[in-house]
Amino acid sequence: MTYPNLLDRFLTYVKVNTRSDEHSTTTPSTQSQVDFATNVLIPEMKRVGLQNVYYLPNGFAIGTLPANDPSLTRKIGFISHMDTADFNAEGVNPQVIENYDGGVIELGNSGFKLDPADFKSLEKYPGQTLITTDGTSLLGADDKSGIAEIMTAIEYLTAHPEIKHCEIRVGFGPDEEIGVGANKFDAEDFDVDFAYTVDGGPLGELQYETFSAAGAELHFQGRNVHPGTAKGQMVNALQLAIDFHNQLPENDRPELTEGYQGFYHLMDVTGSVEEARASYIIRDFEKDAFEARKASMQSIADKMNEELGSDRVTLNLTDQYYNMKEVIEKDMTPITIAKAVMEDLGITPIIEPIRGGTDGSKISFMGIPTPNIFAGGENMHGRFEYVSLQTMERAVDTIIGIVAYKG
């Protein structure tokens, strides 16, 4: 189905810079997200028909569409995030390419282009309307496409009371891209049986498995002496960092793994001979494998300290989120419903693990099973990001189908 306000709504959203800041100590991490929620989303939530609309100190804008059929007793939530990834989000100037011809798309005057030879996903979209960047910023389809789709679904349901639906709760939140947005999510206040994050990629994505994730911060303490007299005295902290890294499995890196394979990812190294620091992220799907990866890093640190004769390697491990499959597989109702709705709409569900996490990873462990459904974005987090308007329309169809489902 086509929705006349969907495109303009999306274009309005992406032109607002809501980039999050991982170094911030506030919630949300940037004032722009507060302004976007209170000045743009809250008024529009009220206009499209949501009731009891409010903004919480945790950065979430919340609203409710009451059920219009007493036989539909479920309460279902839909969640999308306001922030965008760590890439330029100022001056977003989207291009709308109608009836895409399957060829190269020049991204404004930037010199960058979307070429099917480089981005095979473009082969799915001839004849469709694509929204791209102008090459100077990201687009923000992750996840403003999700926000626009949820808002449009509510607008349509309000205008068509003949479509019977259950109670719907909507939540638009901050800071998903920096991994802390759901930390303060109020599951008791949201009060639904289950929810969906509308934060996926291409048409048909339906996901209920994520990585389990941890961060590892390492400090290496060296001893700096003049290199001319260093023998037997100098301890080079940078060399310790190299030695530690070289003891990790050489093929367990993001660029060499796929599917259900986990990894260690070295994110940053800084330092000097005297001291050095390294930051890693650890990812795996199975709980035992995840715990084994953390234990392996600790074992390497302990072994190095033993060989060095002092505690020169300090490791701090912090769990970040867990595979929501552990929660959702106990009651697959949200997956069963979404899958049935997609199939009724002629959409082939793509059920595969997310090699990442969503807000749903944390919210699921707060007591609300929250799988993820497609929002349409491709090549997210950079200048080559784009989204199909037709896929966004199908996401709206799916949301409407889920809340009207009577099975």
Swiss-Prot record:
Residues engaged in binding Zn(2+) 1: 81, 142, 199
Gene Ontology biological-process entries: peptide catabolic process; proteolysis
Catalytic reaction list: Release of the N-terminal residue from a tripeptide
KW tRNA-binding (keyword) present: no
UniProt xrefs under InterPro entries: ArgE/DapE_CS (IPR001261), Bact_exopeptidase_dim_dom (IPR036264), Peptidase_M20 (IPR002933), Peptidase_M20_dimer (IPR011650), Peptidase_M20B (IPR010161)
Localization of this protein: Cytoplasm
Pfam families: M20_dimer (PF07687), Peptidase_M20 (PF01546)
CDD domains, sorted: M20_peptT
Note accompanying the cofactor annotation: Binds 2 Zn(2+) ions per subunit.
UniProt GO molecular function: metallopeptidase activity; tripeptide aminopeptidase activity; zinc ion binding
Residues holding Zn(2+) 2: 142, 177, 381
Its EC number(s): 3.4.11.4
Any single GO CC term annotated in Swiss-Prot or TrEMBL for this entry: cytosol
HAMAP family: Aminopeptidase_M20 (MF_00550)
Name of protein: Peptidase T
Origin species: Streptococcus pneumoniae (strain 70585)
Gene encoding the protein: pepT
